Each structure stands twice: as structure tokens, then as C-alpha cells.
Amino acid sequence: MRTEPDRKSSYGRSMTQTQQAQKILVTGATGTVGRQVVAELLARGHTVRALTRDPATADFPAGVEVVRGDLTDPDSLVPALVGVTGVHLITFGGAYFAPLETGPRILELARAAGVRRVTVLHGGEATPLEQAVRADGRVDWTVIMPVEFMGNALEWADGIVTAGEVREPFVSRLSAMVHEGDIGAVAAVALTEEGHGSQEYVITGPELLTVGDKVATIAAARGRDIALVELTEEEAVAQWRAAGHPEDVIGFLLEAYGNTPEVGRTVADTVEKVTGRPARTFGQWAAEHADTFRAG
């Protein structure tokens, strides 16, 4: 069952008001969420060590210590774990992003290195690594469970720029989509502050939006109208196949969009409770990315 803090406590205060700087290891650091965790930790004054299989292409801001490692080979993490107090984990790894079976060994190494806190980015199902973390009683763990990313709207950019339109099925579906930066902010607090052990945080934005709402918001941000073309399921499947999506992904999209689970269309106040500030709106996200939706 999801649990949440029942008071704001010191959540959301700057690091200098509440604690000393800490060193945090971020795995999956080059991913969409990983980069936001890195950015938020830096903004709060902490030291970040970013794990990647290819440091040469990581492209992190100055001040981030980039180290080589692979979650499918836990012993490769030993140097990266030295001196860190917290670790952000993902549940998939390797070249084909298979569910990680290495959770118990990763946790064993983390405990031996003195790690006190672990966050896990939920992978959409009960993965072996997440199960191993939940079963561990010797570190403070927090499971981070975001709903649909606002960044998914970037998939519309080509159609908007070239044809001034968005072509989607299920246009009346509701989503409590979340700004990726807010995912990073919640993870950063859980990794560096007390009071988040054994917690499962569902992270959403502050509003429910239809596809039409999102399109109108992007249109306002870019300063030009966008047509919304509703597709049938058959037309949507054909479009996704033409885009190269495999059949299992198409099946997932049909289920997620055609029968959005309640958790994905219910606003939660987790961001404000944990960070002390409101969750960012889709309007804010659209303003940040307005140029992406403009021609030229």
C-alpha cells in the first residue's frame, strides 16, 4: 500500500539549512529520470557520482564525477560505491534493458560500503531488483513511481512542426502526467533527508489533462494553433507500426491509452508533501520546450 509523509517537516528547505553535503551515486544517470536526479542533487549542493556504461558519451555538467559500471555486473560498482551515502537505482540493465536479477548482490555491496539510503525507479511491474530492495531491512529504501512523463509529448514535435497537427487515438483519456524534474526532486529529497524509508511514492502532476488539453497548451506556448486529429484504434496501430514500434509496445500503448489505470488519472500531492513546493504544470513544461514545437 502506498504511504506518504503526514507532515511537511523540513522537506523542501535548502540543503544548507538542514544538513551537510552528501555524495550520491546515480545509476541510469544518462536516462530521462537519471539526468533529473543528477540535476536536482547538484542544485541542492550535493556531490554526484554518475554511473554509466559509456562515460565518454555521458555529457554531464561540470562537477559531476562520471564513473564506468554496469548493474548487470555488480562487482563493477565497487569503486563507485566508495564514500557514497545514497544510491539511486533502476530496475533494468544491459544492452537490451532486461529486468535486473542482481539486486541482492548490489544491496550487499551497498551495505558494505556504508550506503544508508536507496531509491528505486519503479519499472512498471514487480521486478526482481525492486523486490530485493523492498525485502531489505538494513537500508532506508524509497520506491519512486511516476505516472506518464510530460516529456512523452515530444513525440508530437515532428507532426506539429511539419504539418501543424497531432494524430492520436483516445483523445478524451485523462492523464495526471508529471514533469520529469519533479521526479528528480522527490528522489533527491528521499536520498538525502530522513523520513522516507519504506515509502512508496506515486508522483503525478497537479492536474488532469486530456489529449486536447495538452495540444491546446503546446499551441499556446508556441504561439500557433495545432490541429488535433483523432485516430481509430486501427489507424493508431498502423501509425505505430510504421514508426517501427514492436508488437509488444503497441499492445502496451493500446492498454495504457485505451484503458488508463486509475493511478495514472488520479492527482497525488506527493511532490508538494516531499519537496515543499507544488508540482509543475504542463503549461510550465510546454513553455520550457516551446522552441521544439516551432518550425525553424
Segments the model singles out, each with a brief description of its role:
Residues G69:
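Cofactor-binding loops of NAD(P)H-dependent oxidoreductases
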Residues E4-G12, E233-G296:
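A hydrophobic C-terminal alpha-helical subdomain
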Residues R2, S10, T16-A62, T72-V84, ...:
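Oxidoreductase cofactor-interface core, primarily capturing Rossmann-like NAD(P)-dependent enzymes
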